[in-house]
């Protein structure tokens, strides 16, 4: 059965043949992988469906199980999400700690832009005011962290007002999309300035399946969800011997 196929309880998804000793020895490890990755893909599919029709894309995160990142990110892609960063090498993300170490948000962005790495530059905003500052600094994307839906709407409105007033920095040279390290999945890479005249907007923090639709608002391009990989329940799978001939 091809991966990504939706199944119902009781459906046989695969058949294997081999020596009984080998099959029974590998049973638990094989099921652990299948249950874990199928659970990630299943939860991801639910999030993707929750925002259908809005144009918003679901992103995974680096909050993955140690040593399983490549597999878990493949599972989120099978579920319909876009892969975010695989590591620190394929995108610059300025967060609160980076800003503190660099001497402030503006200084952190300045230092990042001074390095011609050809990587997308994303910066985290914790308030509407920080988002406004980042928009004037010319970042590719602004990550709104732990915003309420009303704060997201207010931020988009204010950024568009800044754009109309000509107060946003011009676009950086277009950032090439980078291929994912496995599975041929495209890594989400922002364009310099979105068609709306403002940096792309990503929303993260406090996002659950029950409320994600509330955050899929006009002006939002991405919603990143750590729960896809750090909180996905395992799919209930079992292996049964039915022929010993």
Residue ranges of model-derived segments:
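Acidic/glycine-rich phosphate/pyrophosphate-binding loops and surrounding catalytic core
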Residues: 1-126, 130-137, 141, 153-158, ...
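Extended hydrophobic secondary-structure segments
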Residues: 143-149
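Short secondary-structure boundary segments
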Residues: 146, 205, 227
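Active-site catalytic pocket residues across diverse enzymes, especially alpha/beta-hydrolases
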Residues: 159, 163
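Intrinsic disorder/low-complexity segments
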Residues: 164-198
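Active-site loop ensemble at the mouth of alpha/beta enzyme cores that anchors a bound cofactor
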Residues: 238-245
């Amino acid at each position: 059965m091809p991966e990504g196929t939706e199944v119902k309880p009781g459906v046989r998804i695969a058949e294997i043949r081999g020596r009984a000793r080998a099959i029974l020895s590998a049973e638990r490890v094989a099921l652990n992988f299948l249950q874990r990755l199928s659970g990630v893909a299943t939860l991801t599919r639910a999030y993707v469906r929750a925002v259908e029709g809005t144009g918003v894309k679901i992103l995974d995160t680096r909050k993955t199980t140690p040593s399983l990142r490549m597999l878990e990110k493949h599972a989120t892609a099978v579920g319909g999400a876009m892969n975010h960063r695989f590591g620190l090498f394929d995108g610059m993300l300025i967060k609160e700690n980076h800003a503190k170490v660099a001497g402030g948000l503006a200084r952190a962005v300045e230092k990042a832009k001074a390095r011609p790495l050809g990587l997308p530059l994303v910066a985290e905003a914790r308030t509407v005011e920080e988002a406004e500052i980042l928009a004037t600094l010319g970042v590719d994307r602004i990550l709104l962290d732990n915003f309420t839906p009303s704060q997201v709407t207010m931020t988009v409105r204010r950024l568009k007002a800044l754009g109309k007033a000509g107060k946003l920095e011009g676009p950086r040279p277009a950032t090439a999309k980078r291929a994912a390290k496995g599975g041929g999945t495209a890594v989400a890479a922002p364009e310099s300035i979105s068609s709306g005249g403002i940096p792309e907007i990503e929303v993260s923090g406090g996002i659950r399946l029950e409320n994600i639709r509330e955050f899929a608002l006009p002006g939002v391009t991405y919603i990143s969800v750590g729960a896809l990989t750090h909180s996905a329940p395992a799919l209930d799978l079992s292996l049964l011997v039915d022929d010993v001939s």
